């Protein structure tokens, strides 16, 4: 893959934006830790269960600062609401809970467990809220803690927490954050310098729900060309209508200069599309690059192996083996069709913000998966004191 050079004006904006992110407390660092300062957040999402280990910063009860030390996930596709995915999710939740206790010596009362808005939305659409209640009960039984609180968060709450957990304070009021999850997409921006007043951006579509809708349309023809055709049809239907409405209703175009995208697909695209920025947790996104990458996923996926992408890296100071390893991780989480679904959704959203009169700046946040759950833990800890 030939690395696409970043234009000078984009590089300057990226440098400023990226440096603020790097100085932000919510980044991964190697640090001496005290067990008393450690907390854990377990997030049950559409695709799997995720664990974030958080170290609260100095004066955290006042500032809310934190450091995300460890991230671990287990994929189990709870969103299918089948007996097998149900059992796998309970097992995943329990194993991550026990991992936090055994490996990090975190007390049970410092472990917070939350059901994400993507699960909630899909369960409501399929009339499967009883599955969520059963999941909570089974998890409590598994860890022998019948009184544990396992709240179900809504899209507004998750979007607000994502912004607080991902976007540094210096960019908080001119950045529109969009988190593309497995089950839905949510985000927004804070109005009038008030972190309690989020202008919500919400879609009932995420990487997994787009892929599922595409699979349902394929009938007997399971070929890749048919998948691509049906994917385009899915995106041209309700998702496109929701995107256009959500963008126009948000008023974000005139109110924000920076548009940051987080979620698993943001990490995947950033890792595969910009391998020379492998050491950066935030990378700039060029619309034309994204469009070409989206086409390549369907037409020439064989050229996107970890080995071939890493070999294309020109900078000799970078570790190509590590780059290939990270791309391999991406492709274990997202197969070709999942990448096509998620990237196409990302492309359709970016297209709506790609203006002709006023140039906007787009960014991909790689470690955004710890964002909202980290902010939830931080907020919960603050409320304890």
Mark where each language-model region is.
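Residues at the starts of beta-strands that form the adenosine-phosphate
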Residues: 107-111, 174, 258
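N-terminal glycine/serine-rich phosphate-binding loop of ATP-dependent small-molecule kinases
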Residues: 26-38, 49-50, 56-117, 133, ...
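Short, glycine/charged-enriched secondary-structure capping and boundary segments
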Residues: 25, 56, 127-130, 190-193, ...
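Short glycine-rich, Thr/Ser-proximal phosphate-binding strand/loop in the N-terminal lobe
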Residues: 47-84, 193-228
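Bacterial Sec-dependent N-terminal signal peptides
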Residues: 1-28
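Gly/Thr-rich phosphate-binding beta-strand-loop-beta motif of the actin/hexokinase/Hsp70
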Residues: 30-63, 166-199, 203, 264
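Extended hydrophobic secondary-structure segments that form protein cores and membrane-embedded regions
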Residues: 40-41, 71, 112-116, 151-153, ...
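Helical "lid/coupling" subdomains associated with nucleotide-phosphate turnover
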Residues: 81-94, 121-131, 140-173, 199, ...
